[in-house]
């Protein structure tokens, strides 16, 4: 990758005021980042723009937490994402891969062949790229009922964890947990 460039971008808050957002950018050739263009780093003015609580939804999902990324070389990808996010603290996830803790949530980076054991399920297939996302629900039974009522084909992994596969054309999955402890890399 090219050197990082710190920039300020402007956005408008709900009151119509111009707010500066600090951004860290770099140019990448597609060959430099084959697994994904992950844009889940950090958005500083989030607190300003969402000064009121995010409205609740009927599905009871309340927060995006993690992005699950697969790579042929998780060690190299972890080093790159750690550098890009300016986060030096990484943690080994057993033999599955690595976790980079962000200001909100994590990047979980693993080998594609480790995906089936990542959530102890056979839901995810071998791939390179963004394999899934994790979100939190404040009421798993209500979330499951919402999915069922809307004819969404979800999987109940256990009483605290659901999975909602994306269409095959997109691939991947959203994992919905009651809290962060249900995801294997949170420990």
Label each region the model flagged.
Residues 1-187:
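Glyoxalase I/VOC metalloenzyme domain signal
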């Amino acid at each position: 990758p090219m050197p990082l460039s710190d920039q300020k971008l402007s956005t408008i808050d709900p009151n119509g005021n111009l707010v500066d957002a600090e951004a860290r950018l770099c140019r990448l050739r597609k060959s430099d980042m084959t697994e994904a263009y992950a844009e889940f780093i950090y958005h500083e003015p989030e607190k300003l723009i969402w000064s009121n609580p995010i409205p609740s939804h009927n599905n009871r999902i309340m927060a995006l937490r993690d992005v699950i990324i697969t790579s042929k070389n998780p060690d190299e990808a972890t080093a790159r994402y750690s550098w890009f996010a300016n986060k030096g603290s990484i943690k080994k996830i057993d033999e599955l891969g690595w976790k980079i803790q962000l200001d909100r949530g994590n990047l979980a980076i693993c080998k594609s062949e480790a995906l089936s054991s990542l959530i102890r399920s056979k839901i995810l297939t071998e791939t390179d790229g963004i394999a899934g996302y994790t979100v939190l629900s404040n009421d798993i039974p209500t979330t499951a009922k919402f999915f069922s009522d809307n004819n969404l084909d979800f999987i109940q992994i256990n009483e605290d964890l659901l999975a909602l596969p994306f269409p095959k054309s997109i691939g991947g999955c959203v994992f919905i947990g009651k809290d962060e402890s249900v995801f294997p890399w949170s420990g």
